[in-house]
Amino acid sequence: MIVPHAFGQDRLIAPLARYLQQHAGMAVEWLLHDDRAIHDYIAAGVDCAIQVGVVTDPGLVALPLAEVPRIVVAAPSLLGDGMPPQEPAELAALPWLALRTYYRTEVELTHGVSGKQKRFAIQPRFSTDSLYALRSAAIQGVGVAIGSRWMMAPALARGELVQLAPAWQAAPLPVSLVYPYARFYPARLRRFIELIRSEASTLFGEMPGADGV
């Protein structure tokens, strides 16, 4: 199975453990990838994958699991003594971090109430394909970042990060379980699909104690 790093190292380990406990004779190869380098699942021996973002491969069945909210964050040290920015125009003037998988040189934010959208260019000081590296760089005060709310929640609770322009958010990212079309699906895949779908709201929902930030 192919899983994005952030989910594969954290939130999906518990259901994977339950799956293995329920099926004692089962073995799982757990591959962590944030890109989509594998195109032929059958040739690669891959049963299924968790994909974040829009599924564009017409050869894959895509089961929607959730949408992950994304917010704008930065370290207090980056902001100095001033008030955290409240509007997108203020964000454009700050140093930025980029998560190459989802944004590089441009950011678009949507107002949570009015639905109004604002788009502006950024010149990242730091660019990465790792959500963990992005969060760490943000905590160190390197720049402003856009990341999954569940991923940033612990650092927000500890005061290592603050949310900027809280009335504005980046578009949520869809999370899907995907697998190739086939005439027959093995029982191991059907059981895993059942488990993930039954726990999707818990797995991909908000972090406990995040207070909606």
Q: How should these model regions be labeled?
A:
Residues 1-58, 209-213:
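Central regulatory/effector-binding core of bacterial HTH transcription factors
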